[in-house]
């Protein structure tokens, strides 16, 4: 353990359009090579497209989609004796958000639509309806944790 002081977490500024800190964080997740203005165009374009496609308010749609993707449990590898067990552990709230955002962006990048904004919009609409690749990823993680419930006593 280092003897220096513990560095506090940075406060993220809310995004300028909707005033949401979660959305500002999401823009940072979408961003590639430090190109934030392009990431903002993609996210805001996706929100507009998703809102027009589903007929819901953009920010509410985003919140519902994230809520449907957030995992509650995950598995972590734990070495005991000579074998490695997949131990189910609960996910911290900050990590839940981070994983949900990451999975949403990964699923969007694998889609077939023309632009990233349209891919993201499609994935947002699917996630808000509890379908799509990102929701499938969450279900897979939950299924994995459920299958390894027997090793839950190895938690640390």
Curated annotation (Swiss-Prot):
Belongs to the universal ribosomal protein uS7 family. The keyword Ribonucleoprotein applies. PANTHER family: RIBOSOMAL PROTEIN S7. This is Small ribosomal subunit protein uS7. It holds the Pfam family Ribosomal_S7. GO terms for biological process: translation. InterPro entries: Ribosomal_uS7, Ribosomal_uS7_bac/org-type, Ribosomal_uS7_CS, Ribosomal_uS7_dom, Ribosomal_uS7_dom_sf. The keyword RNA-binding applies. GO terms for molecular function: rRNA binding; structural constituent of ribosome; tRNA binding. One of its GO terms (cellular component) is small ribosomal subunit. Part of the 30S ribosomal subunit. Contacts proteins S9 and S11. One of the primary rRNA binding proteins, it binds directly to 16S rRNA where it nucleates assembly of the head domain of the 30S subunit. Is located at the subunit interface close to the decoding center, probably blocks exit of the E-site tRNA. Keywords: Ribonucleoprotein, Ribosomal protein, RNA-binding, rRNA-binding, tRNA-binding.
